């Protein structure tokens, strides 16, 4: 089985803040459900051909987004 974490990158952009980029579309869909249904987290999403980007803005930190993604992975 592939490691789902290898399909995810968390970056901090000076203009957009913290961005989680997921190259597994099924995992991204599940993560979006987790964010909206379980945590009511505010984010913007950008769908591209082979990846989905979650924009969390400048008010979040990479460590908070990593923790949120870790919580999501524990629910799978």
Predicted regions and their residues:
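Short, ordered beta-strand-loop transition motifs
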Residues: 11-15, 45-51
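Acidic, low-complexity, intrinsically disordered interaction modules
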Residues: 34-49
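Charge-rich, low-aromatic oligomerization/scaffolding segments with amphipathic character
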Residues: 31-35, 61-73
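N-terminal acidic leader/helix
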Residues: 2-37
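Ordered hydrophobic segments in well-structured contexts
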Residues: 17-19, 42, 55
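Helix N-cap motif at beta-to-alpha junctions
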Residues: 24-27, 58-64
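A generic structural motif
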Residues: 50-60
């Amino acid at each position: 089985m592939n490691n789902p974490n290898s399909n995810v990158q968390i970056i901090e952009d000076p203009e957009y803040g913290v961005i989680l980029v997921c190259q597994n579309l099924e995992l991204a869909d599940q993560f979006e459900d987790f964010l909206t249904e379980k945590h009511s987290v505010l984010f913007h999403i950008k769908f591209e051909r082979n990846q989905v980007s979650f924009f969390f803005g400048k008010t979040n930190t990479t460590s908070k987004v990593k923790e949120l993604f870790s919580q999501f992975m524990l629910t799978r």
